[in-house]
Amino acid sequence: ENISYDIEKLDIDKYSEKLNFKDNPRMISHNCHIMQSKNFALKEDYDLIYFVEDDYIHTENAIEEMVCSYQKFSSQTKDDIILCPSDYPYLYQKYENTHILMGHKKHWRQVGESLCTYLLSKNTLKKYWSYYEDMFLNNYDPYEKPLHDLYKKVFCFSPMPSIAIHYTNINSIYGLSPQIDWKKLWDENK
């Protein structure tokens, strides 16, 4: 299958003056990247947009699972939704009620938090632009706080088990997703 994509060079100077903080060079670069990618997505002609960070590895069928599940869940909820492809271990730190839905080939559960890798509609990005703008103009702890607030208005779902693994510090709460052979997935993607 052909999936269309575009790549654009990051222009930090174009965005850095808009930020409400100046004391963290790494986050300035990060936030400028986030802002540019969101602005880029707004001007492109795509119905669905997948924002993905560079430290994720996906299963072979991840995109198919997300697109088909998106269609199914948005039909069931009669509204746009957001899909996060990773089943983060930190999501199991809290005891909270959730909804479980059957996606294309995976079960998905409603989550109230995610990091910055997710699939959403262009309509959602436009309608809730203020949440994204708030996220990249500021340096919250956690950084994704505006996303977490958004998920109180828009359903966000995460697959069980993951269809993408965040290869970060495995000893952190953002570490490797449960119930998946991360070494095998790594080897398959070499």
Which residues fall in each region the model found?
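Structural alpha-beta junctions
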Residues: 12-22, 75-79, 149-157
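Conserved catalytic core of nucleotide-sugar-dependent glycosyltransferases
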Residues: 48, 59-131
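The conserved acidic donor/metal-binding loop of glycosyltransferases
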Residues: 54-57
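Active-site-proximal specificity loops/subdomain of glycosyltransferases
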Residues: 1-46
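Conserved glycosyltransferase catalytic-site signature
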Residues: 30-35, 63, 112-117, 137-148
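C-terminal catalytic/acceptor-binding lobe
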Residues: 122-123, 127-190
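Acidic carboxylate-rich catalytic motifs and surrounding loops in phosphoryl-/glycosyl-chemistry enzymes
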Residues: 1-2, 86-89, 157-164
